[in-house]
Amino acid sequence: CAVNALLADGDVLYIGTERGLFIQKDGQLLQVQTDKNMLAACNRIMDLCLNEDKSVLWLATVQGLFSYSLKDGQINSWHFRENVPEADYFRCLTRIGETLYLGTMSQGVVCFDIPKQTFAHTVSLGCDVISDISGDGKETVYIATDGNGVHFLSHKDRKVVRRFFHDVNDKEGIRSNSIYSLLVDDRGA
């Protein structure tokens, strides 16, 4: 089955696939499904991240947001909007503090407040197709759009503080506003 996301944490590897979550630890491979039906859309895991104390694994799926407790295996789910086509669900996520930032195919970036367990929209980026999202873990969320370049969102102020976009007059600029992936190094560059 197709692998959509990998997350390494020490000697543990979390693998998000089209058929659920796989956890490789101590030479063993454990499969975890959000639904008993292997073909259910919620088993299509697009991205993964850990909470602050590494006790919960967050799963962005095409049918909502899921949490998987690494202590007891309990699975919980949240849905931003009910009865929305599969494309409106989550394809990427990152976390800063107690906030998850989730990229969607048609709703832009959505925030999830972990303690309050509530969703909210962030500012408009001029393109609601989010292809990748990353963060520095402290202050900045980096967002790639499929049509309006790259945006740097302030976690504290919830506004865009910088952006890169295609400009025909800038020969040194990016060549397209369709950006499909981001890689942020430990310096936030």
What residue spans do the PLM features occupy?
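Carboxylate-rich, polar loop motifs that coordinate divalent cations or form catalytic acidic clusters
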Residues: 1-189
